[in-house]
């Protein structure tokens, strides 16, 4: 983990992530002021608008930095080095994922904390921290899995965008049939429920929605583990 943190700092990954989250929250605010012409932005509006940016544009925003953090090891031919220090495809991948998520979690917490302090409103802080973290974690896992399979960053980004567009189209066709593919998508049933919760005095989502999100993330992790299991040889070949 220490090695990956050092690489994140030396490769400016942590700086890029910080800039992305600043942009995400600022875009959430300016969409309300500039597009919706809202004169009095409430904390609920600000948070939900920022959440919308994260769910609708997050994959495009974060695909580069996530793919870069993994694919750079292929382009620099570093996989043999990882093998020599006792790493395998699982430790290689999950350490990188852990570092990316911890850094994102820190920026999410900081962003929500600053906004909550500005409005003196922490009523939905825990819920928002859970939702933003879940949304970003899915991006890290999905883009990370794609990046492990792809030989360079451009292909990883391209495949990730195709995946995102396909999931949006499928949910638009039928959120009952394909809703599990992209639970945070605006066309899905959970999206309006989250908006209602943020506009009310309820502090959290219903237990069914929370369980659904957890099962979704666990499913991605299981699929990822299966993909890694059958990619051991490919991982070594692409990094030599």
Swiss-Prot record:
Q: What is its main location?
A: membrane
Listed transmembrane segments: 13-33, 50-70, 97-117, 126-146, 153-173, 210-230
Knockout-associated phenotype? Up-regulates expression of the LiaRS two-component regulatory system; this effect is more pronounced on modified competence medium than on rich or sporulation medium.
Q: Which GO terms describe its cellular component?
A: plasma membrane
Keyword Glycoprotein in record: no
Q: Where in the cell is it found?
A: Cell membrane
Induction remarks: Transcriptionally repressed by rok, this was not found to be the case in another study.
UniProt superkingdom:
Bacteria
Protein keywords: Cell membrane, Membrane, Transmembrane, Transmembrane helix
* UniProt entry tagged with the keyword Transmembrane: yes
Report the membrane topology from the UniProt record.
Answer: Multi-pass membrane protein
Cite the record's note on assembly.
The complex is composed of 2 ATP-binding proteins (YydI), two transmembrane proteins (YydJ).
Reported function: Suggested to be part of an ABC transporter complex YydIJ involved in export of the modified peptide YydF.
What is this protein's name?
A: Probable peptide export permease protein YydJ
Species of origin reads Bacillus subtilis (strain 168)
The UniProt gene name for this protein comes to: yydJ
């Amino acid at each position: 983990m220490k090695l990956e943190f050092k690489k994140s700092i030396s490769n400016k990954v942590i700086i890029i992530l910080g800039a992305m989250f600043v942009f995400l929250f600022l875009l959430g605010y300016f969409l309300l002021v500039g597009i919706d012409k809202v004169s009095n932005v409430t904390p609920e509006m600000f948070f939900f608008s920022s959440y919308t940016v994260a769910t609708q544009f997050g994959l495009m925003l974060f695909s580069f930095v996530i793919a870069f953090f993994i694919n750079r090891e292929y382009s620099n031919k570093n996989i043999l080095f990882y093998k020599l220090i006792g790493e395998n495809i699982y430790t290689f991948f999950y350490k990188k994922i852990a570092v990316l998520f911890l850094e994102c979690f820190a920026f999410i917490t900081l962003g929500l904390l600053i906004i909550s302090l500005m409005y003196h409103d922490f009523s939905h802080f825990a819920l928002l921290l859970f939702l933003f973290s879940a949304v970003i974690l899915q991006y890290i896992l999905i883009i990370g899995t794609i990046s492990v399979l792809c030989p360079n960053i451009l292909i990883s980004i391209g495949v990730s965008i195709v995946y995102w567009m396909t999931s949006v189209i499928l949910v638009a066709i039928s959120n009952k049939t394909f809703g599990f593919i992209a639970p945070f998508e605006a066309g899905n049933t959970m999206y309006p429920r989250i908006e209602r919760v943020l506009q009310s005095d309820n502090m959290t989502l219903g237990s069914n929605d929370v369980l659904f999100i957890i099962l979704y993330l666990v499913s991605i992790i299981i699929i990822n583990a299966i993909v890694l299991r059958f990619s051991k040889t490919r991982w070594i070949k692409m990094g030599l």
